[in-house]
Regions:
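Class I SAM-dependent methyltransferase Rossmann-like catalytic core
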Residues: 1-20
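Conserved alpha-helix/loop element of class I SAM-dependent methyltransferases that forms part
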Residues: 16-36, 46-50
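Conserved acidic residues
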Residues: 35, 56, 100
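Class I SAM-dependent methyltransferase SAM/SAH-binding core
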Residues: 38-91
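A short acidic, Gly/Pro-enriched loop at the edge of an enzyme's catalytic core
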Residues: 87-102
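A short SAM/SAH-binding and catalytic strip from SAM-dependent methyltransferases
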Residues: 100-113
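A short glycine-rich, Lys/Arg-flanked "PGG" loop and its adjoining helix->strand segment in the class I
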Residues: 115-130
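Acidic carboxylate diad motif detector
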Residues: 133-135
Length: 138
């Protein structure tokens, strides 16, 4: 990742996607999550406060170290274990059929090969698993 992508973009996204007017959308996309969840594009952890009690674990995929630093306060307050588990939604480091649900919020439009990322999500979701997403660019 270049300097702009690594240092500037995560902060812009944190501010733009962290506004109060998107909280109802975050709440809605997260409300039916349950079990073991993979979140691609974890960013600065803005979904963490909206994980329902039915979520047992989150494997968070995020390329930006800055995003992780911005997530620190939310991660410390999380009621669900969240682990950084990879950097690339196009190549998920998990076995097939590992997750009950996938989560992506305003991320798919930023992935260079979204079809590959969606295939990867399908691969790691258990049969009957669900993908929960909100997007502005698809």
């Amino acid at each position: 990742m270049g300097l702009y992508s690594e240092r500037v973009v995560p902060r812009i996204v944190h501010v733009a996607c962290g506004s109060k007017n998107v909280e109802p959308l975050r709440r809605r996309v997260c409300e039916h999550l349950a079990g073991n969840v993979v979140e691609i594009g974890f960013g600065s952890g803005l979904n963490v406060p909206f994980y329902p009690a039915s979520v047992t674990r989150v494997a968070a995929v995020e390329p930006s170290d800055v995003g992780w630093k911005l997530a620190d306060k939310r991660l410390r307050a999380a009621t669900v274990p969240v682990e950084r588990s990879g950097r690339d939604g196009q190549s998920l480091p998990f076995a097939d059929n590992s997750f009950d649900a996938g989560l992506s919020s305003w991320t798919l439009c930023t992935i260079p090969d979204v079809a590959t990322a969606l295939r990867e999500l399908r691969r790691v979701l258990k049969p009957g698993g669900s993908l929960h997403f909100v997007e502005h660019g698809l």
